[in-house]
Amino acid sequence: MKVSSAIALLLPVVAARFVDSAFEQDHVQLHPEQAAAEQFLIELSPGETRWVTEDEKWELRRNGQRFMDITDNRDLGLASAQSATTGPARVFPPNVTLDEEVFPLLANLSKGELQTHLEKLTSFHTRYYRSEHGRASSNWLLGQVKKTVGEAGGFKHGITVKPFKHPWGQNSVIARIPGQTNRTIVVGAHQDSINLFLPSVLSAPGADDDGSGTVTILEALRVLLQSEAVLAGKAANTIEFHWYSAEEGGLLGSQAIFNTYEKASRDVRAMLQQDMTGFVQRTLDAGEVESVGVIVDYVDPGLTAFIKKVITAYCDIPFIETKCGYACSDHASASKAGYPSAFVIESAFERSDDHIHTSDDLIKYLSFDHMLQHARLTLAFVYELAFADFDKLDKAAAVSVAPEMGDL
């Protein structure tokens, strides 16, 4: 019997043992009897589904299996699948072009801001999405995003910061910066954390997974709003920053959001996920070069190619191609909804942080210098695509694939 299997058998017993004391002392919501009775429909690969209990979900995660919990979002992607054969492929700029505007902004990114926010975020006992701590951390994050926008004067220009509410209590957070069109560029990170051994009881500081991504895009937002053109809504495209709830439970928060967007026919032109942006030690220990891991499986190839150009132009370290499998982060929800999505991580996937999903996912293992490179990527990515003329790009692409007279 695997060790994880043996531990899994003990989980309901141990959870029940800690219910009273944990709830009274830490205010963590513990409902082991409810979790044991619930059944969830998960998707382990495209079209491969299975009904499981809550404990079985965590057993799969402990064994390295990723999945989407599609129980409440079984229709995600249906509308986009019906139009996929007739809709045009999305195209992206062939090169970066706004270096004169972007580089001055990059100079204002701050490691101090990253550290201050991450210290607060990891001070919560856990950010488990079904816990009171998870609710509290989400409320703090919502307030911090509002503070960031307010200090920049963003609310006077129509920028909004709103919770996207979920039935489990921990809400997602969406900051929206209106542009000249409703075409939307999204950057995301997940705000929740988990300890895969007794999620409702044990601590889960989640410094790297995904506290690092959460504060990375928050810092990118802070500096982006220093652009008068962006602040005043002069960008060609609308920009959204997303902090997803319940990624660890099977991409629950992001599925709910992109399901809503798909049904509303929202025009999302690009989505970039930042999940784990601060750990480099295993890369260095292996004698390899510090780099940004660019995921190349289950992503949009055109958007991913553009991201490589952004890294080359605006980051101080190179990129390395790597794979993470199906449903490995929230970009998978956007992709399933028919939106071009991409994912970057701190290193080659096999060199990524091995402290995650435990009480040992701590700040002391992270590099804020490396996190800053991800912030540079996020800021440059958003700025370049915010001002991209997608109408012009679409027309150019249509001309390039049009048949010549001799082919008719």
UniProtKB/Swiss-Prot annotation:
Pfam families: Peptidase_M28 (PF04389)
Entry's Gene Ontology cellular component terms: extracellular region
Entry-listed glycosylation sites: N95, N108, N182
Subcellular location: Secreted
Role of this protein: Extracellular aminopeptidase that allows assimilation of proteinaceous substrates.
Names of required cofactors: Zn(2+)
Protein name: Leucine aminopeptidase 1
